[in-house]
């Protein structure tokens, strides 16, 4: 059964695993509140604006009507 307790194999302990263990010490911990969600949303919005600008340059869109573009 899924709820049944079983003996767990701890595996092989290596030097590399010991060195990398501190990187995984925060596993499962959640910061209270919104944390850095607002910062992430801001950067996502800025990235979306960047992508729109690149797309408009590629398509020679409305905002760039007066800018001459030539690939020759």
UniProtKB/Swiss-Prot annotation:
Listed GO biological process terms: photosynthesis; protein stabilization
Protein name: Photosystem II reaction center protein H
GO molecular function, a single term: phosphate ion binding
Segments crossing the lipid bilayer: 38-58
NCBIfam families: PRK02624.1
Species the sequence originates in: Oltmannsiellopsis viridis (Marine flagellate)
Domain of life: Eukaryota
Keywords (A to Z) from UniProt: Chloroplast, Membrane, Phosphoprotein, Photosynthesis, Photosystem II, Plastid, Thylakoid, Transmembrane, Transmembrane helix
Subunit structure: PSII is composed of 1 copy each of membrane proteins PsbA, PsbB, PsbC, PsbD, PsbE, PsbF, PsbH, PsbI, PsbJ, PsbK, PsbL, PsbM, PsbT, PsbX, PsbY, PsbZ, Psb30/Ycf12, at least 3 peripheral proteins of the oxygen-evolving complex and a large number of cofactors. It forms dimeric complexes.
Function: One of the components of the core complex of photosystem II (PSII), required for its stability and/or assembly. PSII is a light-driven water:plastoquinone oxidoreductase that uses light energy to abstract electrons from H(2)O, generating O(2) and a proton gradient subsequently used for ATP formation. It consists of a core antenna complex that captures photons, and an electron transfer chain that converts photonic excitation into a charge separation.
Gene that this polypeptide is encoded by: psbH
PANTHER family: PHOTOSYSTEM II REACTION CENTER PROTEIN H
Post-translational modification: Phosphorylation is a light-dependent reaction catalyzed by a membrane-bound kinase; phosphorylation occurs on Thr residue(s) in the N-terminus of the protein.
UniProt membrane topology term: Single-pass membrane protein
Residues with Phosphothreonine modification: 3
InterPro entries reported for this sequence: PSII_PsbH, PSII_PsbH_sf
Family indicated by similarity: Belongs to the PsbH family.
């Amino acid at each position: 059964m899924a709820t049944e307790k079983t003996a767990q194999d701890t595996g092989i302990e290596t030097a590399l695993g010991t060195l990398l263990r501190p990187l995984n010490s925060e596993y499962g911990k959640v910061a209270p509140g919104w944390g850095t969600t607002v910062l992430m949303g801001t950067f996502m919005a800025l990235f979306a604006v960047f992508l729109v600008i690149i797309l408009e340059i590629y398509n020679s869109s409305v905002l760039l009507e007066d800018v001459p573009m030539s690939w020759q």
